[in-house]
A protein has these predicted regions:
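Alpha-helical membrane-protein topology signature
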Residues: 1-202
Length: 202
């Protein structure tokens, strides 16, 4: 698992658990429920495999995956979500909802969950083909979400706009911008995919 950040997956697990708490309160459809459970279970399985299961465990480079994801990811997003939720219920005169608060938190956290992975790749500089493709498609799905919002806003008369979702979606896509540039540059030129170091960028 060289080049893969388990900390990014740990952040995504927190995202899915806090976002899908409505599994216990609201039933939408069997498909919806199964997919939510699948997201949580598959992400937890990936984390367990990388951290504890041999021989995968020995290929995980802890020394490169050192971003303080709880201090600089979870904590700031929790504070921001609380402030946003309080402002929202005050302006709309709604009651406090822990499920809504955690949903907002999950949106903020998802937007920066890729940071540990991008930092690991920059430290390695040369990115393996499989790892590069994996991260590219993780970012591409979020970029496609933006196109989906534009489409639905145009064609659905009663589409509900959510500016926190918009902001976080754009932010997440922008975090990938540098990676996308070098990934596509390597693919079009047929060269080896590598990312510049911070020293090179100056």
């Amino acid at each position: 698992m060289t080049g893969i950040s388990v900390r990014t997956h740990e952040l995504y697990l927190i995202v899915f658990v806090t976002r899908y708490l409505d599994l216990f309160t609201t039933f939408y459809s069997l498909y919806n429920s199964v997919m939510k459970v699948l997201y949580i279970v598959s992400t937890a399985s990936i984390i367990y495999t990388i951290r504890f299961q041999e021989p995968i465990k020995t290929t995980y480079d802890k020394g490169q995956d050192t971003f303080l994801h709880y201090q600089f990811g979870v904590a700031p997003c929790a504070v921001l979500a609380f402030i946003t939720h309080i402002i929202g219920i005050s302006s709309k005169h709604n009651s406090f909802s822990i499920i809504e608060l955690l949903w907002t938190f999950s949106i903020y956290l998802e937007s920066i969950s890729i940071l540990p992975q991008l930092i690991v790749l920059q430290r390695y500089r040369e990115v393996e083909n499989l790892t590069g493709n994996y991260v590219f498609f993780m970012g591409a799905y979020r970029a496609l979400y933006i196109l989906n919002w534009i489409y639905r806003a145009h064609y659905e008369p009663h589409y509900q706009h959510h500016w926190v979702v918009y902001f976080c979606g754009v932010l997440q896509t922008l975090l990938y911008a540098d990676f996308f540039y070098y990934y596509l540059k390597a693919k079009t030129s047929g060269s080896k995919f590598s990312l510049p170091t911070a020293k090179q960028g100056n």
